[in-house]
Amino acid sequence: MKRTYQPSNVSRKRTHGFLVRMSTKNGRLVIKRRRAKGRKNLAVSIASK
C-alpha cells in the first residue's frame, strides 16, 4: 500500500501558500493568528534562488 504523504513542492504551495491564504477571508484570519502568535513562517514558502 502506498504511503499517504507523497511530497511535492507544487501541490504544497498551491494548497498552503501565502497567496492562497490571502485569497479568502478565513485564510487571512490564519495569517493574522500566526502573526499575533509571532510565527517565523506565516505560510508555506519554498526557498528559491
UniProtKB/Swiss-Prot annotation:
Gene3D superfamilies: 1.10.287.3980
Transmembrane parts of this sequence: none
Gene Ontology CC annotations of this record: ribonucleoprotein complex; ribosome
Pfam families: Ribosomal_L34
Keyword terms, alphabetized: Ribonucleoprotein, Ribosomal protein
Molecular function as annotated in GO: structural constituent of ribosome
Biological process according to GO: translation
Family statement: Belongs to the bacterial ribosomal protein bL34 family.
Protein name in UniProt: Large ribosomal subunit protein bL34
Organism of derivation: Geotalea uraniireducens (strain Rf4)
